[in-house]
């Protein structure tokens, strides 16, 4: 489990109702930070960072109704009666979008 710092007012920080996420990680791949500014300039938001190693953990596309991608694995801690905030938020977005 690693501590991911969440950007203030990001969707993921609202879902977790926190400025950090504690989730299980298993890194085999890393985002190459040399592309960060280019991707930010076209609307990608880097909303979660593992600060100890400056690793991108969460990205969002704010212009879409719900787009969150994570390097951590919320499926490992999610349970049927207690889904992780990302899954709960995703399901809520699906329900809201289908009204």
Curated annotation (Swiss-Prot):
The active site is at residues 73, 75. Allosterically activated by GTP, when glutamine is the substrate; GTP has no effect on the reaction when ammonia is the substrate. The allosteric effector GTP functions by stabilizing the protein conformation that binds the tetrahedral intermediate(s) formed during glutamine hydrolysis. Inhibited by the product CTP, via allosteric rather than competitive inhibition. It holds the Pfam family GATase. One of its GO terms (biological process) is pyrimidine nucleobase biosynthetic process. Its EC number is 6.3.4.2. Gene3D superfamilies: 3.40.50.880. Pathway: Pyrimidine metabolism; CTP biosynthesis via de novo pathway; CTP from UDP: step 2/2. Keywords: ATP-binding, Glutamine amidotransferase, Ligase, Magnesium, Metal-binding, Nucleotide-binding, Pyrimidine biosynthesis. InterPro entries: Class_I_gatase-like (IPR029062), CTP_synthase (IPR004468), GATASE (IPR017926). The keyword Magnesium applies. Residues 1-99 form the Glutamine amidotransferase type-1 domain. L-glutamine binds at residue 28. One of its GO terms (molecular function) is metal ion binding. GO terms for cellular component: cytosol. It is an enzyme of class 6 (ligase). It comes from the Bacteria. It catalyses: UTP + L-glutamine + ATP + H2O = CTP + L-glutamate + ADP + phosphate + 2 H(+); L-glutamine + H2O = L-glutamate + NH4(+); UTP + NH4(+) + ATP = CTP + ADP + phosphate + 2 H(+). Catalyzes the ATP-dependent amination of UTP to CTP with either L-glutamine or ammonia as the source of nitrogen. Regulates intracellular CTP levels through interactions with the four ribonucleotide triphosphates. Belongs to the CTP synthase family. Homotetramer. CTPSs have evolved a hybrid strategy for distinguishing between UTP and CTP. The overlapping regions of the product feedback inhibitory and substrate sites recognize a common feature in both compounds, the triphosphate moiety. To differentiate isosteric substrate and product pyrimidine rings, an additional pocket far from the expected kinase/ligase catalytic site, specifically recognizes the cytosine and ribose portions of the product inhibitor. This is CTP synthase.
């Amino acid at each position: 489990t690693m501590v991911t710092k969440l950007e203030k007012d990001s969707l993921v920080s609202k879902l977790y109702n926190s400025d950090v996420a504690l989730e299980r990680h298993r890194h085999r791949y890393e985002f190459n930070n040399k592309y960060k500014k280019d991707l930010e300039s076209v609307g990608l938001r880097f909303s979660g960072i593992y600060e100890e190693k400056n690793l991108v953990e969460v990205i969002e596309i704010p212009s879409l109704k719900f787009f969150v991608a994570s390097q951590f694995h919320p499926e490992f801690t999610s349970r049927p009666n207690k889904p992780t905030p990302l899954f709960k938020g995703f399901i809520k977005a699906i329900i809201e979008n289908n009204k």
